[in-house]
Amino acid sequence: MKREWRKIVGVVAWDEGTARALDEAGVDLISVGDSGAASFDELLVFCAAVRRGTVHAVVSCDLPEPTVDAARRLADAGADLVKVEGVENVCAIAAAGIPVFAQIASSAEAKPMEDVGAALIDFRHSGPEAGSEAVAAVSIPVLGGLGGGPWLDGRMRAVYKLLGGALAAYADDVRAGRPVKGD
């Protein structure tokens, strides 16, 4: 998508129904996050559920146990990519033939992650300067959530944050007597 100059739309979700709605809406990447202190076994269940609800989108899953065996288990559960931090972890998992969504905290980490086999990068809290540096340093897409912006190749956002904004707009429209999209 980076080569096509098309921004990547990513959303974090944990269940089949939400994944189906996101997939039908044209979301490019659905990521199963480990926020909420989910255990590894719970992530396997969430990953399988998201895979069942997804036809077109790429599915990634956070890897709290950065081992090749754990990465294989997530791939077997339906993850197209596993999301992990640390260049050594990315290197080992990519060398095992499992596509990696690398998580970084500074622009200096972007190129080493690409060099060891990352397919995609999640750069949280990037800001315009550091984010632009990371994007320029690599040929793979660099996404971001909080602190990200148009300088990145795409964005990640948790579904509940998107849903909250959409529901607030819906409530405002109904209360103001405005037409509601989809009527």
Predicted regions and their residues:
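Conserved, mostly hydrophobic/aromatic
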Residues: 15, 22, 50, 100, ...
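N-terminal amphipathic alpha-helix/helix-capping segment at the start of soluble metabolic enzymes
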Residues: 1-12, 16
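Conserved anion-binding
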Residues: 59, 66-116, 151-154
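C-terminal alpha-helical cap/extension of soluble enzyme domains
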Residues: 138-183
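Glycine-rich, proline-tolerant flexible connector loops at the mouths of alpha/beta enzymes
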Residues: 18-46, 65, 81-93, 118-133
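Generic structural signal for well-ordered alpha-helices
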Residues: 16-19, 44-51, 68-72, 87-90, ...
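Short, well-ordered coil/turn segments that N-cap beta-strands
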Residues: 5-9, 26-28, 54-59, 78-80, ...
